[in-house]
Amino acid sequence: MLGLQIFTLLSIPTLLYTYELELLDLTRTPPEKELEYWCTYANHCRFCWDCQDGICKNKVFENHSPILENDYIANCSVFRRNEFCTYYVTSIKPHEVYRTECPQQSHEWHEAVIRKWQKLLTYGFYLVGCVLVANYVRKRSLQTVMYLLVLLVIFFLLSQLMLYRELEDKKHKIGSIPPKRELEHWCTHGKYCDFCWDCQNGICRNKVFKNHPPIGENDFIRHDCWTIHLPNRCYYQKIYKYPDYHMMECSQPTPYKWYDNLMKKQDMM
């Protein structure tokens, strides 16, 4: 009973935090405070660009060179349901759907409080566990307790070994060129990274998506990207004037035609 009460009290802040996440109805104009997030994943969406007289400037990333207005800039709609963030490319039919990891930059102060409460929650579980073990030891013989301790030690060692092997299998050290088996993943999120393209004589072809039309080598393909793949988080870092980190989902994306019918032509800059 005591353990249940502790769990309930310490879980309240986490539940409030989950409830606090704002919903975002389907819209073509996401809030200005979220533009940096959406334009990181959906750099080709029209709401990321300010186009005048055929010249488009990026609204978020000032170091992005102006580009000519063409079919690369697509109409998009976005929406968010707590942990699910999605944007649709509506310029083509059927609409292409992309799922991304939801932003959390608007809750920095609250996350610090939640982390403290989560620590207290963990310590509360430890306390309840110790009370239960002490109560069990008091009612059992010494031999039974020793057997229990041996089993716990064996279980702990096996779990650490399995965890270590899992981390080693999933770990991808920082590098400028990700493993070939992961190119589809990285080039879906970081499609402007140089390792996604094979450029010769000013013409660049996509290494992963064969249906991607060749494009002229220009400032869109200008980033030296470094990738980091940890067990539960994936990052890529764009090296252009200033290092810029971006987080993404680690799951392998479903193959789709993310550029088909969007690049009918490519104007040389």
From Swiss-Prot:
Signal sequence annotation: none
Gene Ontology cellular component annotations, sorted alphabetically: host cell membrane; membrane
Compartment(s) where it occurs, according to its Swiss-Prot or TrEMBL record: Host membrane
Induction: Expressed in the immediate early phase of the viral replicative cycle.
UniProt key word Transmembrane: yes
Pfam families: v110
Recorded topology in the membrane: Multi-pass membrane protein
Extracellular topology ranges: 19-116, 166-269
Purpose: Plays a role in virus cell tropism, and may be required for efficient virus replication in macrophages.
Family assignment from sequence similarity: Belongs to the asfivirus MGF 110 family.
Name of the protein in its database record: Protein MGF 110-1L
Provenance organism: African swine fever virus (isolate Tick/South Africa/Pretoriuskop Pr4/1996)
